[in-house]
Amino acid sequence: MTVYRGEVRALDRLTLTIAAGEHVAMLGPNGCGKSTFIKTLTCECYPAIEPAPFTLRIMGKDRWSVADLRQALGIVSQDLIAECTRGLSSDFAEFPRRVTGRDTVLSGFFSSIGLSPHHEVTPEMAHKADAILERLEISHLAARPLNELSSGEARRLVIARALVHEPAALVLDEVGNSLDLRAAHQLREMTRTIAQAGTAVIIVTHNLSEIIPEIDRVILLRNGRVLDDGAKEQLLTSEALTRTFDLPIEVGRHNGYFHAW
């Protein structure tokens, strides 16, 4: 499929298949089309009919309601992270002190950030939210106001929010940007917990350190196209990443994680 952002081809005849249950990392430099790929999944960008017809199929279906899509995919986009780490959605700016970590997770049922008086939280919703907080070991954040949390703590709650519908796959778009070492480590460990529990994880990033050991497959993007696609060990190499980023890069590995310099 081809997707334009203004006059620019952000995705250029992209052809890609990700199997159900597969843990994948999509890696590439800024401007390579990663965020456009996410926005296409969330229907914020639409593929062009020309130069060729396209098919966008998710979980075997090419027609989706928004509600069904949310249950199939939990997507944590850069835009959502930015909205949450500012403190609150503007829709709920009048309730800054009331929005807690638990509210943030519960708001996933209503596609909001935080809860408003017209949102009716059922006992089943409350139970699911508490179970997710406990499973991800962030129950200690449940009662704390969102606007008093660190960026890393808020991001972990936003990821928990994406899991309330028990999606088959979780898509994470640059979720580790600008975190300190401790917060980045906590986020990686939580992502590993999710992957090990059976939810497929798709990590979209330009940073090798975000690629958890559970990832088996890497897709390298450049100029809106798939430059390479294959096993992690074959593509997270100095040669492949030098070609992808157009910059001399050396790659090392330690305790299942890759790093570059």
Regions from the PLM with identified roles:
Residues T205-H206:
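H-loop/switch region of ABC-family ATPase nucleotide-binding domains
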Residues T42:
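Helix-to-loop junction immediately C-terminal to a conserved catalytic motif
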Residues L106, F110, V121-L141:
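Conserved ABC ATPase "signature" region
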